[in-house]
């Protein structure tokens, strides 16, 4: 009978030993998954380097876009806010709203865009150019969706005509 008792003890010990080996692995995997899920959008975009590379390409696309160039207010706005300045301001803004360390120092969206007379179509063109820049630098779909959700919240402050 003592042998049987020992067998139960051994089986329990084996289960505990297996649990002792598997539990840290499972907890480690959960920690990695949680760390990724909790990492900021800023970090997932590659930090300031990733953001500035995409923004640089995006602003260059906007400056060259024929549809946007037909809007005289946008064309005039480029004289007061040249591309290098826009690249800085947009990078700073994206950095802040995605959880990065930057502090946006530019004007609020509504007053800084009101004079540009941006239409719904021009908004869509800008969104398309942004998507092209994100795709060019292989920004993953989840991060793109998060960015477009953030950008979408500014539409009411930027679009002033149908």
Please name every model-derived segment:
Residues 14, 32-36:
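Elongated fiber/stalk and passenger scaffolds
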Residues 35-162:
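Core of compact, soluble alpha-helical bundle domains
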Residues 1-14:
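N-terminal secretory signal peptides that target proteins for export/translocation
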């Amino acid at each position: 009978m003592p042998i049987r008792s020992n067998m139960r003890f051994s089986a329990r010990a084996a289960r505990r030993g297996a649990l002792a080996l598997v539990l840290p692995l499972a907890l480690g995997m959960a920690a990695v998954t949680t760390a990724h899920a909790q990492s900021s959008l800023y970090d997932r975009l590659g930090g300031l380097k990733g953001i500035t590379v995409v923004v640089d390409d995006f602003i260059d696309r906007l400056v060259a876009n024929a549809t946007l160039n037909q809007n005289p207010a946008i064309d005039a706005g480029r004289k007061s806010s040249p591309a290098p300045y826009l690249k800085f301001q947009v990078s700073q803004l994206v950095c802040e709203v995605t959880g990065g360390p930057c502090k946006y120092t530019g004007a609020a969206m509504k007053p800084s865009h009101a004079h540009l007379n941006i239409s719904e179509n021009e908004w869509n063109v800008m969104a398309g150019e942004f998507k092209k820049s994100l795709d060019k630098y292989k920004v993953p779909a989840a991060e793109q969706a998060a960015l477009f959700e953030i950008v979408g919240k500014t539409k009411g402050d930027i679009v002033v005509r149908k």
